[in-house]
Amino acid sequence: MPVTEVGSLPELNNILERSDANRLIIIDFFANWCGPCRMISPIFEQFSAEYGNATFLKVNCDVARDIVQRYNISAMPTFIFLKNRQQVDMVRGANQQAIAEKIRQHYSPTPANPNAASDSEKRFLEQFVKCSNVPRSYQDEVFKALARSVMPEELVGRAMTEGPRDEKAILKDLLHWFKTQFFTWFDRPTCPKCTLKCSTDGLQGTPTREEQKEGGASRVEVYICDGCNTEMRFPRYNNPAKLLQTRTGRCGEWANCFGLLLAALNLESRFIYDTTDHVWNEVYLLAEQRWCHVDPCENTMDRPLLYTRGWGKTLGYCIGYGSDHVVDVTWRYIWDSKKLVTQRNEVRQPVFENFLSKLNSRQAEGQTEPRKRELAVRRVCELMEMMAQEAKNHKIGWEKIGDDLGGRITGSEEWRRERGELGESGPKLLAEPIKLAPPTGPAQNYLEFNYDVITDTYSQPPEIGFSAQAFELENVQRVEETDWNMTYLCRKRGDAPGNISWHFDLKSLKKSIEKIEIRMAGIQKFEKGKAMAIACLGDSCMRLPIDCSALTIEDPKNAEILKITATLSGGEGAIGFQQAQIFRTELKRGGGARTESFSVKIWMKN
């Protein structure tokens, strides 16, 4: 703990009153004109860094005369040792060894109160205080009106209806719109003068008065253009209303702005802060009487094991901040609660629980009695749900539960790799022929399989991610161009070609096939790029039309496996890898309707 200079007796009394009975307090009485005082000063600083559960103070004898008189100081330096507000020892002169011996004699590494935090624990716990104000701003009626004004009218109308509403459907559409049309991810800026993308990390800057007042910016990242030395600023705004204007940021800005949109649609939410550097939301589903995980960055919901099982993170503390409560929700997002207890070593558990209880009480000021009872019942149900879900997860198994959980998708690949959030090496593949879901309803002789590049989902499980149903995949990525409002699959950066294939198990259909119709949208070639898609059945192969029309295969005989392969190659220059694409589609599509970027339709004979 750094050395603190005390300037008056009331200030010293305040420190003594707040100190734990076991806490050692050492006061260095000095004068600026005293040579030995200057000599011992850096050593005193070293002691303060070494002994965390002690308070090191300095008193200038020419300034704080009231303190000097209390302790009858007549020579400098003099060191007074206090414990439980009483003087327990004293050292006169700049005697390093004597000071060290007295510290060791009286020092206690832990507080007398088992629930009182040590200095290192206090430093760790400080991070949880700053988030408590975030959800309170969501209750501002002006902010909520601003939020509704930027959202699609149709979505607002569905959410604000007086009758029953499908909260999950509203959430899903809100996530999709927010991710694909409204908010953008900030990695590094592009220079407004020479259009060169900055390749270096930002420097820490100081927010201007305007950035602090209008946007609540607590810090600023400053970037210098590699080409023309232009300075670019990225203020880290905390005001969600300001984020409605800027519409860019990283996970903190995403979750903060999204939290305001949720409040504007009368969806009760929490702001979830994770000590391993991620932020997301939770929404209380009234129809299901439970809290639901929602991550606007990833455009996903109700997948709480995404971070541990998908990204490969080791979570420690996930704290949920509502407008009137603060709770620990870590158990919802982990695989093994017993293991978590052994890994939490930053703060003792009783200290953490005591701290969180006080923080929750402060957040709950002004609660009505009915609201207190409501939250108490919810919390009991939530804890029971977490325990039941963990037991259910273990029955399913670690491998199987990760079938539709991949690595992080927001941010550059380099950035995600540095953070260790890519998940398992390479995307997860089905790596076996697709067994089409059996038909339902009156169309018993018709099967359909499709992929939507906008939502990056398939029509049957495993649904999430373009690789989830692929048989083979090499050097292919999904790209969202927010500036052009387009999304597609293309090669990864470099010269190597890209390939992706899907195999369909036709033998398992157990019926003769009348015809197969295959359609692949958005096959695009630019400059010298090459894009080709072929379908192979038995001993023959056919090219898929590039104009989005269907390839129809009539009355296939003895069909067992249908193989569809897309190959991407060619291109030149820095963006050559993007000059061959499949599924190229405009992002701006309202209403959350699915698009058929890729479809396979099969009619069977009666």
Swiss-Prot record:
<dbReference type="GO" id="GO:0048671">
    <property type="term" value="P:negative regulation of collateral sprouting"/>
</dbReference>
<feature type="binding site">
    <location>
        <position position="194"/>
    </location>
    <ligand>
        <name>Zn(2+)</name>
    </ligand>
</feature>
<feature type="active site" description="Nucleophile">
    <location>
        <position position="251"/>
    </location>
</feature>
<dbReference type="Pfam" id="PF00085">
    <property type="entry name" value="Thioredoxin"/>
</dbReference>
<dbReference type="Pfam" id="PF01841">
    <property type="entry name" value="Transglut_core"/>
</dbReference>
<feature type="binding site">
    <location>
        <position position="191"/>
    </location>
    <ligand>
        <name>Zn(2+)</name>
    </ligand>
</feature>
<dbReference type="GO" id="GO:0047134">
    <property type="term" value="F:protein-disulfide reductase [NAD(P)H] activity"/>
</dbReference>
<dbReference type="GO" id="GO:0005829">
    <property type="term" value="C:cytosol"/>
</dbReference>
<dbReference type="InterPro" id="IPR038765">
    <property type="entry name" value="Papain-like_cys_pep_sf"/>
</dbReference>
<dbReference type="GO" id="GO:0005783">
    <property type="term" value="C:endoplasmic reticulum"/>
</dbReference>
<dbReference type="GO" id="GO:0005634">
    <property type="term" value="C:nucleus"/>
</dbReference>
<dbReference type="InterPro" id="IPR006588">
    <property type="entry name" value="Peptide_N_glycanase_PAW_dom"/>
</dbReference>
<dbReference type="InterPro" id="IPR036249">
    <property type="entry name" value="Thioredoxin-like_sf"/>
</dbReference>
<dbReference type="GO" id="GO:0006516">
    <property type="term" value="P:glycoprotein catabolic process"/>
</dbReference>
<dbReference type="GO" id="GO:0000224">
    <property type="term" value="F:peptide-N4-(N-acetyl-beta-glucosaminyl)asparagine amidase activity"/>
</dbReference>
<dbReference type="InterPro" id="IPR008979">
    <property type="entry name" value="Galactose-bd-like_sf"/>
</dbReference>
<dbReference type="GO" id="GO:0015035">
    <property type="term" value="F:protein-disulfide reductase activity"/>
</dbReference>
<keyword id="KW-0479">Metal-binding</keyword>
<dbReference type="GO" id="GO:0030513">
    <property type="term" value="P:positive regulation of BMP signaling pathway"/>
</dbReference>
<dbReference type="Pfam" id="PF04721">
    <property type="entry name" value="PAW"/>
</dbReference>
<keyword id="KW-0862">Zinc</keyword>
<dbReference type="GO" id="GO:0046872">
    <property type="term" value="F:metal ion binding"/>
</dbReference>
<protein>
    <recommendedName>
        <fullName>Peptide-N(4)-(N-acetyl-beta-glucosaminyl)asparagine amidase</fullName>
        <ecNumber>3.5.1.52</ecNumber>
    </recommendedName>
</protein>
<dbReference type="InterPro" id="IPR050883">
    <property type="entry name" value="PNGase"/>
</dbReference>
<dbReference type="GO" id="GO:0045454">
    <property type="term" value="P:cell redox homeostasis"/>
</dbReference>
<comment type="function">
    <text>Specifically deglycosylates the denatured form of N-linked glycoproteins in the cytoplasm and assists their proteasome-mediated degradation. Cleaves the beta-aspartyl-glucosamine (GlcNAc) of the glycan and the amide side chain of Asn, converting Asn to Asp. Prefers proteins containing high-mannose over those bearing complex type oligosaccharides. Can recognize misfolded proteins in the endoplasmic reticulum that are exported to the cytosol to be destroyed and deglycosylate them, while it has no activity toward native proteins.</text>
</comment>
<feature type="domain" description="Thioredoxin">
    <location>
        <begin position="2"/>
        <end position="108"/>
    </location>
</feature>
<dbReference type="InterPro" id="IPR017937">
    <property type="entry name" value="Thioredoxin_CS"/>
</dbReference>
<feature type="active site">
    <location>
        <position position="295"/>
    </location>
</feature>
<feature type="active site">
    <location>
        <position position="278"/>
    </location>
</feature>
<feature type="binding site">
    <location>
        <position position="225"/>
    </location>
    <ligand>
        <name>Zn(2+)</name>
    </ligand>
</feature>
<keyword id="KW-0256">Endoplasmic reticulum</keyword>
<dbReference type="InterPro" id="IPR038680">
    <property type="entry name" value="PAW_sf"/>
</dbReference>
<keyword id="KW-0378">Hydrolase</keyword>
<dbReference type="InterPro" id="IPR013766">
    <property type="entry name" value="Thioredoxin_domain"/>
</dbReference>
<feature type="domain" description="PAW">
    <location>
        <begin position="404"/>
        <end position="606"/>
    </location>
</feature>
<comment type="similarity">
    <text>Belongs to the transglutaminase-like superfamily. PNGase family.</text>
</comment>
<dbReference type="InterPro" id="IPR002931">
    <property type="entry name" value="Transglutaminase-like"/>
</dbReference>
<dbReference type="GO" id="GO:0036503">
    <property type="term" value="P:ERAD pathway"/>
</dbReference>
<feature type="binding site">
    <location>
        <position position="228"/>
    </location>
    <ligand>
        <name>Zn(2+)</name>
    </ligand>
</feature>
<dbReference type="GO" id="GO:0005737">
    <property type="term" value="C:cytoplasm"/>
</dbReference>
<keyword id="KW-0963">Cytoplasm</keyword>
